[in-house]
UniProtKB/Swiss-Prot annotation:
InterPro entries, sorted: Folylpolyglutamate_synth (IPR001645), Folylpolyglutamate_synth_CS (IPR018109), Folylpolyglutamate_synth_euk (IPR023600), Mur-like_cat_sf (IPR036565), Mur_ligase_C_dom_sf (IPR036615)
Activity response to pH changes: Optimum pH is 9.6 (isoform 2).
Cofactor(s) this protein requires: K(+); NH4(+)
Domain of life according to the entry: Eukaryota
Name of the protein in question: Folylpolyglutamate synthase, mitochondrial
Function, in words: Catalyzes conversion of folates to polyglutamate derivatives allowing concentration of folate compounds in the cell and the intracellular retention of these cofactors, which are important substrates for most of the folate-dependent enzymes that are involved in one-carbon transfer reactions involved in purine, pyrimidine and amino acid synthesis. Unsubstituted reduced folates are the preferred substrates. Metabolizes methotrexate (MTX) to polyglutamates.
Annotated pathway: Cofactor biosynthesis; tetrahydrofolylpolyglutamate biosynthesis
Length: 587
């Protein structure tokens, strides 16, 4: 590591230690906690997770996919081989009555809505999603709940040993991390005899390992945007081609309103595969003639996800003869770019209940704890960041203003992978934060005690330097002090409503200050300043110079009548914050 990088890292640890009152850099490296560490699940479960972590992790898997991208059939054949070695054939997956969902933003929320709607009918549901926020078992759910540590442990070791026993010289012993969990989910759902499985695509669609599913009941494509460009392509049209790879001959598919280019690609892809593709009407069309629909997830953008989920659930019920019969029929063929409009129907009481009861942590989630309000939304693409800002500003507009002192706004941000942090931060800047805080996706500097939070794909140096780069991007934007308020113009999204946009926050008298911390717990301790009972206040530093922003900001945060903290960017950052704010999630 260069001398400059060494100095940067030393400065970072110094700032973190100053904010927490740790007297040596060694203590900061050890991740000493100022509050009791929540009791971890049984070591047997943790042992299973540690063994899972020894497999090729997601970042390595992405690199492998990039190398093999020219021959997608090889990837799917490899997944089918793993499936066979585990004791299943692709035909066995037909029994799961799968709903297969892809998209760039909103696919997880769409899946959550869909699963909750169908569960409200009394059906036993399986739900496979990624990534996890706090514990890896969140990725595999039965009836909306993560499988228990005991169930995870049982199925993990059963699959692991079966794959070990079937290895030979012609095949690799174990599938990569994500493929292993996909296989495990299929085994869990089959053994636990679910009535249906909602399966969220990992990355893309055409080459994704979930695409060994050959006969889903119905497929869905949520809103498209730019993400994973090194894998999927650098235009929305290229990404749409990848997403359309989950279409199957004769299997109905639904999508929401997209820009003309990617929508045309989806249409052509569906025609080539002989897949009937339908365009979802707006949620307002389904509300006509009845009371408004109440959504369990906040944010105007969730209405698009809910509209798609209603069509997926309605189609599944029809095709399974659970509620009505017959294929979806277009009400007005050729409505838009030669795509038929999906049927407009009156949502049933079960559908309304499912939409209202949907929970999806880390997405437009609000936690209120005394004077602190935490706004959590894992928005890591430009379009998701736009939706996040609209939701955040709308939430602030509807709040009760305190009378006993000033309000403070804090941004807690991190971005990983091939995302463009400068572009994301520019979208967030008009929220007029008083402080911008950056930290890696580490709950503590040392994560050895929690296997669920371990990440072997990057080094500590890499993640710390990336945070410093984020800070530099933010400071550069702050120095310009001329960033236009992007939210005073009409929504760029198809079907968006300018009436939902908020007036700009009155400009502050001074620019936002920025800080970098070495882990999430250090950042949360500084932000909360002892006003959240979970976190002990940082003690005065001994023998170290106090970072001026940390010192001045601490006084302001302690005196504020209300502190609004937006946690966004990486979902893993959101998960780490949730783990610390809600220790029960780790039990």
């Amino acid at each position: 590591m260069s001398r400059a990088r060494s100095h940067l890292r030393a400065a970072l640890f110094l700032a973190a230690a100053s904010a927490r009152g740790i007297t040596t850099q060694v203590a900061a490296r050890r991740g000493l906690s100022a509050w009791p560490v929540p009791q971890e699940p049984s070591m047997e479960y943790q042992d299973a997770v540690r063994m899972l972590n020894t497999l090729q992790t997601n970042a390595g898997y992405l690199e492998q996919v990039k190398r093999q991208r020219g021959d997608p059939q090889t990837q799917l054949e490899a997944m089918e081989l793993y499936l066979a070695r585990s004791g299943l054939q692709v035909e066995d997956l037909d029994r799961l009555n799968i709903i297969h969902v892809t998209g760039t933003k909103g696919k997880g929320s769409t899946c959550a809505f869909t699963e909750c709607i169908l569960r409200s009918y009394g059906l036993k549901t399986g739900f496979f999603s990624s990534p996890h926020l706090v514990q890896v078992r969140e990725r595999i759910r039965i009836n909306g709940q993560p499988i228990s540590p005991e169930l995870f442990t049982k199925y993990f070791w059963r699959l692991y040993h079966r794959l070990e026993e079937t290895k030979d010289g012609s095949c690799v012993s174990m599938p990569p991390y994500f493929r292993f969990l996909t296989l495990m989910a299929f085994h869990v759902f089959l053994q636990e005899k679910v009535d249906l499985a909602v399966v969220e695509v990992g990355i893309g669609g055409a080459y994704d390992c979930t695409n060994i599913i050959r006969k889903p009941v119905v497929c869905g494509v949520s809103s498209l945007g730019i993400d994973h460009t090194s894998l999927l392509g650098d235009t929305v049209e290229k990404i749409a081609w990848q997403k359309g790879g989950i279409f199957k001959q004769g299997v109905p598919a639904f999508t929401v309103l997209q820009p003309e280019g990617p929508l045309a690609v989806l249409r052509d892809r569906a025609q080539q595969i002989s897949c009937p593709l339908y365009l979802c009407p707006m949620l307002e069309a389904l509300e006509e003639g009845g009371p408004p629909l109440t959504l369990g997830l906040e944010g105007e953008h969730q209405r698009s996800n809910a509209a798609l989920a209603l069509q997926l659930a309605h189609c599944w019920l029809q095709r399974q003869d659970r509620h009505g019969a017959g294929e979806p029929k277009a009400s007005r063929p050729g409505l838009l770019w030669q795509l038929p409009l999906a049927p407009v129907f009156q949502p049933t009481s079960h559908m309304r209940l499912g939409l209202r009861n949907t929970e999806w942590p880390g997405r437009t989630q609000v936690l209120r704890r005394g004077p602190l309000t935490w706004y959590l939304d894992g928005a890591h693409t430009a379009s998701s960041a736009q939706a996040c800002v609209r939701w955040f500003r709308q939430a602030l507009q509807g709040r009760e203003r305190p009378s006993g002192g000033p309000e403070v706004r804090v941004l807690l941000f991190n971005a990983t992978g091939d995302r463009d942090p400068a572009a994301l931060l520019k979208l967030l800047q008009p929220c007029q934060f008083d402080y911008a805080v950056f930290c890696p996706n580490l709950t503590e500097v040392s994560s050895t005690g929690n296997a669920d939070q371990q990440n072997f794909t990057v080094t500590l140096d890499q993640v710390l330097l990336r945070c410093l780069e984020h800070q530099q991007h933010w400071n550069h934007l702050d120095e310009e002090q001329a960033s236009p308020d992007l939210w005073s113009a009409p929504s760029p999204e198809p079907g968006g409503s300018a009436s939902l946009l908020l007036a700009p926050h009155p400009p502050h008298t001074c620019s936002a200050s920025s800080l970098v911390f070495s882990c999430i717990s250090h950042a949360l301790q500084w932000i909360s300043q002892g006003r959240d009972p979970i976190f002990q206040p940082p003690s005065p530093p001994k023998g170290l110079l106090t970072h001026p922003v940390a010192h001045s900001g601490a006084s302001i945060l302690r005196e504020a009548a209300a502190i609004h903290v937006l946690v966004t960017g990486s979902l893993h950052l959101v998960g780490g914050v949730l783990k610390l704010l809600e220790p029960a999630l780790s039990q």
